[in-house]
A protein has these predicted regions:
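Glycine-centered beta-turn/loop sites at beta-strand termini
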Residues: 32, 88-89, 98, 108-110, ...
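Extracellular lectin-like interaction modules
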Residues: 22-102, 106, 115
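Short cationic/low-complexity microdomains
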Residues: 71, 152-170
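Generic detector of solvent-exposed, compositionally biased contiguous segments
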Residues: 76-80, 120, 129
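Short hydrophobic transmembrane-like helices used for membrane targeting/insertion
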Residues: 17, 126-127, 144
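Secretory targeting and sorting signals
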Residues: 1-22
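Intrinsic low-complexity/IDR segments
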Residues: 18, 179-181
Length: 182
């Protein structure tokens, strides 16, 4: 049986109204399972939606996302309703990629396995788990933390903070005033 990934909506603040009536943007939570997961998140050409493509079936909670044409590995989510993304990739060798035009903050947490995690265009938090990870903040003032394993951390343009893990990591800040802690 194919495992599905749960897409859940988490409110930024406790709102006394049902989600369907909420005027405040929410954070979109994406949680991976123990298998190898792949997520690609992009802003659509018209800028009105986020397109999420996965290597496994996606289940959706709430009413801000829907499957286009009943494709279980793809979602479209209303962009103005989303204040940020939080991705917990789970176990396995995972790949999480946000395109650089994503204008909202992104938090990505890698699990066990050799992960490739790419932030978007805003100020992002990228955290590696156990394994030899590739962690990229890309644009914005990013905070990147390596975990156990030989990680490569790259901040990209912006004032980034990079902190290596307990093993021999490679850190590269990119253009900007960066803080590198091996």
């Amino acid at each position: 049986m194919k495992k599905a990934i749960l897409i859940a909506l988490t409110l930024l603040a406790a709102l006394p109204v049902p989600l369907a009536d909420a005027a405040e943007p929410v954070n979109l939570l994406i949680s991976g399972g123990r298998e190898n997961n792949g997520f690609h998140i992009a802003l659509t050409a018209d800028g009105r939606d986020y397109a999420i493509v996965s290597t496994v079936s996606l289940e959706v909670g709430g009413n801000l996302c829907e499957h286009p044409e009943e494709v279980p590995t793809e979602l479209l989510c209303t962009a103005p309703e989303i204040a940020g993304f939080e991705v917990n990739s789970g176990g396995g060798a995972d790949s999480v990629f946000f395109t650089s035009d994503i204008p909202v903050p992104v938090t990505i947490r890698g699990g066990g396995g050799n992960d490739k995690l790419y932030g978007g265009g805003a100020s992002d938090k990228v955290v590696g788990g156990p394994g030899d990870d590739l962690l990229f903040g890309r644009r914005g003032d990013d905070w990147i933390l390596g975990g156990p394993g030989r990680d490569r951390l790259s901040g990209g343009p912006g004032n980034d903070q990079l902190r290596g893990g307990p093993d021999k990591d490679k850190l590269s800040g990119g253009p900007g005033q960066n803080q590198l802690i091996p």
